[in-house]
């Protein structure tokens, strides 16, 4: 769930249990690593044997790889689908988020440097879409896997943050239309992007898994690079600053910086990371 200035109680369908673990910050493997791995030895099926590149967190202000570069790295060692219901959403690309995606309380650099890169321009399996987003925005891929499990169990059709405010309902999702009389969901998709704060990404946020993940981690990067200065103008548990990867994970849920709600969410994501919940047999939904 993406919150810019408001803390709300979230209700997510389906209900998810907690979260992940600590991840070291490191430089992502260069394209040459994937290229040499994919090349392999002559006459062999190298793509099947190549070890996938692991995408690590890149420091604030780092030069990030392009979406096209990340697509090549991911597609060099593609991984299978574990969420069959996502296939229609995984086949759809995203859209531009427009000129006013980030709030006026953010540094103008967020809109200038981050927003134009949010496009959802990728298709693939669910895990490959998450790998692509991790690569593109320079965040440790296991953090992404764990957070997406907390938010939606990796299910793009997840609906959350139900409310009664008709103005907060996206087009096509009027009050009562999605199964709860007098309510509509405000958060959608694999990362539970929230319509009132990210309306520039609609309707692709709902229809495209790649768009949902791309926007979520574009916002994470804006936070990590120090652009979300409004976090120091609202109640907080500490002073917001650049470079706190986990603080920016907690901000996604709580809309505040290292408050009790944010810390509780961070603990959930870290639990799933420790467990590597996405590798468990019961996590797979193949049909």
Task: List each model region and its residues.
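A sequence-level detector of short, solvent-exposed, charge-rich linear segments
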Residues: 27, 31, 163-167, 284
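Poly-acidic low-complexity segments
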Residues: 2-4, 10, 14, 140, ...
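Short, functionally critical alpha-helical segments immediately adjacent to catalytic or ligand/cofactor-binding
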Residues: 129-131, 136-175, 193, 216, ...
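Secretory targeting and sorting signals
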Residues: 1-34, 38
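Non-catalytic cell-wall polysaccharide-engagement segments
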Residues: 2-4, 25-26, 36-108, 115-123, ...
């Amino acid at each position: 769930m993406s919150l810019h200035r408001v803390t709300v109680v979230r209700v997510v369908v389906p209900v998810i249990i907690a979260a992940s673990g600590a991840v070291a910050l490191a430089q992502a493997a260069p394209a040459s690593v994937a290229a040499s791995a994919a090349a392999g030895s002559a006459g062999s099926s190298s793509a099947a044997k190549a070890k996938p590149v692991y995408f690590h967190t890149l420091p604030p202000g780092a030069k990030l790889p392009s979406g096209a570069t990340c697509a090549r790295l991911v597609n060099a060692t593609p991984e299978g689908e574990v969420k069959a219901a996502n296939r229609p959403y995984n086949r759809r690309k995203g859209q531009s988020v427009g000129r006013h995606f980030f709030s006026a309380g953010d540094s103008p650099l967020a809109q200038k440097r981050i927003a134009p890169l949010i496009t959802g321009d990728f298709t693939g399996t669910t895990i490959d879409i998450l790998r692509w987003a991790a690569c593109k925005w320079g965040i440790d891929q296991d953090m992404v896997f764990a957070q997406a499990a907390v938010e939606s169990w990796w299910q793009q059709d997840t609906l959350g943050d139900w409310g009664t405010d008709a103005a907060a309902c996206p087009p096509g999702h009027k009050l009562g239309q999605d199964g709860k009389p007098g309510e509509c969901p405000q958060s959608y998709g694999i990362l539970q992007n929230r319509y009132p704060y990210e309306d520039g990404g609609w309707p692709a946020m709902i229809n495209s898994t790649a768009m949902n993940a791309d926007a979520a981690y574009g916002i994470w990067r804006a936070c990590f690079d120090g652009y979300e200065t409004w976090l120091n103008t609202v109640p907080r548990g500490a002073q917001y600053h650049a470079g706190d990867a986990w603080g920016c994970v907690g901000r996604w849920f709580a809309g505040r910086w290292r408050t009790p709600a944010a810390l509780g969410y961070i603990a959930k994501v870290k639990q799933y990371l420790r467990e590597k919940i996405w590798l468990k047999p019961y996590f797979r939904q193949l049909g």
